Structures are given as C-alpha cells and as structure tokens.
From Swiss-Prot:
GO terms for cellular component: mitochondrial inner membrane; respiratory chain complex III. Belongs to the cytochrome b family. GO terms for biological process: mitochondrial electron transport, ubiquinol to cytochrome c. The lineage of its organism: Eukaryota, Metazoa, Chordata, Craniata, Vertebrata. It is found in: Mitochondrion inner membrane. It comes from Bos javanicus (Wild banteng). Binds 2 heme b groups non-covalently. This is Cytochrome b.
Length: 379
C-alpha cells in the first residue's frame, strides 16, 4: 500500500513542498529567511487577530483601546509588543531575504522574483497602515504626510488623496478603512506567498555557487526541517528578548501622545524599516521628483534581472561585484541613518550623496562590474 503521505490529495501537496522536496545539499543559513518570513507572518496574523478582538477603529477610542489592551487585557501588553516588534523582525528577515537573492543571483527565477517584489510592496503597505492604527501623534502625522505624497500626481492627485482619506483630512473614515485593509492584507500576503512558493518549486532552490544542483539533491526533511526549526527558535528568541527587555527600543516616543491635528511633531519620521526610502524621498527638493524616486527605489528591484551582465549567476566567485554589493549595503545603512535625522546641514547633503550612490551602484556600477569580470575571465 502507498504511504498516505504520498497518496492523500492534500497531504501529497504538503509532502511535495516540505518533506520529499529535493533540495540542494549546500544551501547556507541565508536560505533560512524564507521559512522565517513564514513564521513571522503566522505570528503577526495570530497576535493581530487577538489585538483586533479588543481594538476599536474609531478616532475617539483607538488610542485608549490600545492603552486598555496593555493595561487591562490578560497578557495584552505582550501581544501588543510582540505584534509591534514582530513587524521589525519581519522586515529584518525581508531585507536579508532580498539581499540574499541579490547576492546569489536568485533573481534569475523571474516569476518567483517578481512575485517577491509584489510581496515586499504589499507587506510595506500593510505595515504602514498598521502604524496608523494606535492613533498616536506619529500615526496621525505619518498617515497625513505619506498619503499627501499622492497629491504630487498631476491632475488627479488632490482628488486621489481626498478619496483615500474619505474626507478633507486624515480622520475617522481614514482610520476605519486602514483597519479594514490592515486586517485583510496579511491573508492576501499569505495567498501570494503560496504562489511565490509554487513558482519556486517549479525550478527548485538556487544555491551559493549559482550552479545547477540537479545532479546532487537531498530530501528537505529531515535536513532542512531541523535547520528551519533552529532558525525559527533563534528568531523567536531574538523577538522575545526585544519584547521583554526593550519593547520601545524601535518605536517612536511621540506615538505615546494621542493624535492631535493642531500640533505637528518637530520630526515626522516613519518606522526604522522605511527610513532608507524616506531619506531618498527627502533628498529631492521637488515633490513629484521625490515621490518618483521613492517609488523607483523599491520598484528598481524588478529591473535587477535585466541589469545582470555577468556570465556567472552568483557573486560567490566575483570579488569586484562583491565589493560593490557591500558598498550598496553600507549605503542603505547610511540612508537609514539619514532618514531619522532632521532636515538640516550636513544631513541633507549626505542624504543626497547616498541617494545618488544607491541608484548609481544598481543601475551603472554593478552591471559594469559584471561586464568587466567577464572580460577578465576572457568570456
């Protein structure tokens, strides 16, 4: 008799995806972030669900409902901080996952990569809307500033912004719809993630060398299941250290002040994981130019496969490209730092230089390095 694992219509899907899946024998810990993102998503959905049971999406009660969760609901404080810091862990894993894809040339799996870009944008939208829900000062002003950017779109901009707001300013209607979207999007993300996996399993995983591993595969279980469980335990350890010892480390103190449309905070800034894009936005004096640069800074990922000039897939054996890759990482850290600084000298200039470097590295220097390396290897 055939094993039920391999014959049952539902179980064979799970079997082919997580148990008998042929996997490369040499994938490093950089390949753990995919499963960690799955863990993050499940954690966020569960904690979010319990928060939604006590939260009220109304301008008059939103802030106090979050206070009520932290003070009066059993273990409400830990659920709230796991959800807030879980978002930070989610983005750490996301950026590591994308960085891995860039370094090892995983973007040559076009469908998988493009769906990944869509996932990144959806997660960013979800996180932004979630940040508005506690209805603190930074929630309100963050929502006002970011939605207002759409008014830079010619002709339809103002109408578009008022349509998103549901009025003439960020108000009750905005909060209600943001809560509705913030609730539904994680489930949509889960569905897109399944399509992401489906396309990945059409080709099989890449590996650090960038060379096909079809001649030498090992089963996913037990080798990578145990590796993923270890990764998940380390992720949860890091999250709980953050939640239990420094829950407000990555947050903004301004968000402990209830939203007040009559009082603008001195420095409006998003959560740390959006600071690099915010720095690029601020470094261009023109509003429409800034919005376009902001959009392109993320959408540029979709162009990466077209900018690949090397005859080798991975950067493992390409020292010149490696060097530029790590300069790009340093540049992104610089942008993240600048995004959190006030708009004054010398930060403005540093931000502009870092923004120019970001686009120059991706669009010009890295493709050139690929061509140069081909020439050096007489290819």
């Amino acid at each position: 008799m055939t094993n039920i694992r391999k014959s049952h219509p539902l179980m064979k899907i799970v079997n082919n995806a997580f148990i008998d899946l042929p996997a490369p024998p040499n994938i490093s810990s950089w390949w753990n972030f995919g499963s960690l993102l799955g863990v993050c998503l499940i954690l966020q959905i569960l904690t979010g669900l319990f928060l939604a049971m006590h939260y009220t999406p109304d301008t008059t009660t939103a802030f106090s409902s979050v206070t009520h969760i932290c003070r009066d609901v059993n273990y409400g404080w830990i659920i709230r901080y796991m959800h807030a810091n879980g978002a930070s862990m989610f983005f750490i894993c996301l950026y590591m996952h994308v960085g891995r894809g860039l370094y090892y040339g995983s973007y040559t799996f076009l469908e998988t990569w493009n769906i990944g870009v869509i996932l990144l944008l959806t997660v960013m939208a979800t996180a932004f809307m979630g940040y508005v829900l506690p209805w603190g000062q930074m929630s309100f002003w963050g929502a006002t500033v970011i939605t207002n950017l759409l008014s830079a779109i010619p002709y339809i901009g103002t109408n578009l912004v008022e349509w998103i707001w549901g009025g003439f300013s960020v108000d009750k209607a905005t909060l209600t719809r943001f809560f509705a979207f913030h609730f539904i999007l994680p489930f949509i993300i889960m569905a897109i993630a399944m399509v992401h996996l489906l396309f990945l399993h059409e080709t099989g995983s890449n590996n650090p060398t960038g060379i096909s591993s079809d001649v030498d595969k090992i089963p996913f279980h037990p080798y990578y299941t145990i590796k993923d469980i270890l990764g998940a335990l380390l992720l949860i350890l890091a999250l709980m250290l953050l939640v239990l010892f420094a829950p407000d480390l990555l947050g903004d103190p301004d968000n402990y002040t209830p939203a007040n449309p009559l009082n603008t905070p001195p420095h409006i800034k998003p959560e740390w994981y959006f600071l690099f894009a915010y720095a690029i936005l601020r470094s261009i004096p023109n509003k429409l130019g800034g919005v376009l640069a902001l959009a392109f800074s993320i959408l540029i990922l979709a162009l990466i496969p077209l900018l690949h000039t090397s005859k080798q897939r991975s950067m493992m054996f390409r020292p010149l490209s490696q060097c530029l890759f790590w300069i790009l990482m340093a540049d992104l850290l610089t942008l993240t730092w600048i995004g959190g600084q006030p708009v004054e000298h010398p930060y403005i200039t540093i931000g502009q230089l870092a923004s120019i470097m970001y686009f120059l590295l991706i669009l010009v220097l890295m493709p050139t390095a690929g061509t140069v390396e081909n020439k050096l290897l007489k290819w």
